[in-house]
């Protein structure tokens, strides 16, 4: 098997040394470790096809990995059989931007392209790719599509699904499905690409994508706003929608405990307020038109909220440098939490109108059942995505006889609160291996049944990232 793989990808495309493999089989937060026969790094779609066909013939699972920035262990290789550990398939060497078309606003790229590199290529083409998140320096396009990533710009541009115009996918038997025409109109039946977006590598391996670029918005305005409560933040968002709805590019709510951790651990962070507010909102407006007075609009809306008593303080950025510093605070959340302790990150989505009561209900449950934890909130308020983070100290975590059942118990407690509001337990992070039981427990039974049938149709041997998304017995 190893020699056959070497014959496909060459020596530099195959890693078998256990020490060198370690970063590929362990999640980035060092919480879960898998095993694999080898790490395979193809350099082309044809090589991916040959690798997958070989694995299908040998009955070996294929575990795709992108930038390994996920939070649900979807890239950790875990086989259900000792005799078939499977291979990790990394598309790191497939990092070519194949084409950018300014006329159509389409960039065609390899799946291993890093998000930050795509941002730069889009700017060079006079456009922008509007997906932004804290891991954009390492997250890869294939993984972002496979998890239908969200980020801070969903309120204006939608999640990754809305930015994908076409895909190239290697199926479980090695055949290549090519759908990169990126036509605006195409009514020729099922749009199969949507099955692979958010499938977390369980139906095939994404090797290329046609992505929608957007006009640049060089005219921007940014502010950190101290609000009295989540309800006040919701009211501020509604007022901003009325006045400048088409300009809103981000509206991020952060709780005081989370702000404090960023201040404690983030390097080079400069904070806008002398004291940490109970709740604060990072707002970004953007326009293609340089004449639109965005700072004035922002000051008008925030000023009215200040008069209503919903806002305590606000700082509007007066330079690009200050705006960058604002975003540095927001994008430092994950690393700050990693340094602080063990955070159980909930990825809830509810209707925007339910954000405030959900946060209150979740905080009440957390305080009653888990007093050892500090409850933190980071919320993409514009799209209703609430990250409740229960932060436990490492000393407490070390006393647990078994971490996984406890973590699942905590997650279920908050998931049940979300369910009462008609929300979902996975807004943008995916399901991975971490939440397969929760998907089976909370999903509509018919929807879940149909998902298992789709999996069986595309991957009858269950070799594509087995154990991810669907519970093993269901797949």
Give names to the regions the model predicted.
Residues 1-475:
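Noncatalytic alpha-helical scaffold of FAD-dependent oxidoreductases
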């Amino acid at each position: 098997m190893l020699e056959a793989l070497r014959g496909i990808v060459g020596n530099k495309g195959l890693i078998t040394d256990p020490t060198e493999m370690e970063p590929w089989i362990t999640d980035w937060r060092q919480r879960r470790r898998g095993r694999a026969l080898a790490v395979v790094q193809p350099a082309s779609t044809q090589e991916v096809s040959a690798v997958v066909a070989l694995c299908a013939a040998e009955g070996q699972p294929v575990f795709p990995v992108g930038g390994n920035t996920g939070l649900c262990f979807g890239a950790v290789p875990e086989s259900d059989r000792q005799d078939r550990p499977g291979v990790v398939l990394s598309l790191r060497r497939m990092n070519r931007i194949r084409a950018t078309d300014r006329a159509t606003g389409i960039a065609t790229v390899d799946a291993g392209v890093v998000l930050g590199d795509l941002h730069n290529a889009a700017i060079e083409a006079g456009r922008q790719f509007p997906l932004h998140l804290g891991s954009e320096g390492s997250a890869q396009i294939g993984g972002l599509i496979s998890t239908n990533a969200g980020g801070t710009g969903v309120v204006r541009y939608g999640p990754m699904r809305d930015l994908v115009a076409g895909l190239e996918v290697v199926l479980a038997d090695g055949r290549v499905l090519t759908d990169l025409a990126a036509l605006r109109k195409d009514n020729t039946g099922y749009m199969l690409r949507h099955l692979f977006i958010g499938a977390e590598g369980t139906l095939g391996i994404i090797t290329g994508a046609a992505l929608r670029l957007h006009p640049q918005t060089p005219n921007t305005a940014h502010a950190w706003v101290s609000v009295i409560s989540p309800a006040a933040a919701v009211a501020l968002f509604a007022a901003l929608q009325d006045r400048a709805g088409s300009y809103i590019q981000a509206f991020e709510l952060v709780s005081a405990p989370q702000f404090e951790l960023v201040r404690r651990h983030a390097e080079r962070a400069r904070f806008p307020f002398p004291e940490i507010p109970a709740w604060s909102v990072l707002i970004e407006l953007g326009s293609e038109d340089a004449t639109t007075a965005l700072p004035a609009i922002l000051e008008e809306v925030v000023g009215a909220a200040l008069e209503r008593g919903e806002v305590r303080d606000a700082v509007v950025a007066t330079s690009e440098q200050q705006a960058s510093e604002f975003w540095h605070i927001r994008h430092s959340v994950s690393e700050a939490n990693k340094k602080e302790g063990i955070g159980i990150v909930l990825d809830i989505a509810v209707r925007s109108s339910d954000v405030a009561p959900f946060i209150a209900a979740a905080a009440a449950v957390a305080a009653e059942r888990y007093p050892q934890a500090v409850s933190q909130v980071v919320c993409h308020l514009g799209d209703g995505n609430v990250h409740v983070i229960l932060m436990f100290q490492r000393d407490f975590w070390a006393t647990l006889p078994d971490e996984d059942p406890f973590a699942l118990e905590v997650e279920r407690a908050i998931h049940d609160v979300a369910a009462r509001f008609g929300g979902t337990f996975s807004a943008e992070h995916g399901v991975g291996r971490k939440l397969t039981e929760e998907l089976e427990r909370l999903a509509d039974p018919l929807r879940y049944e149909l998902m298992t049938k789709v999996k069986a149709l595309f991957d009858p041997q269950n070799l594509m990232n087995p154990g991810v998304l669907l519970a093993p017995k269901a797949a």
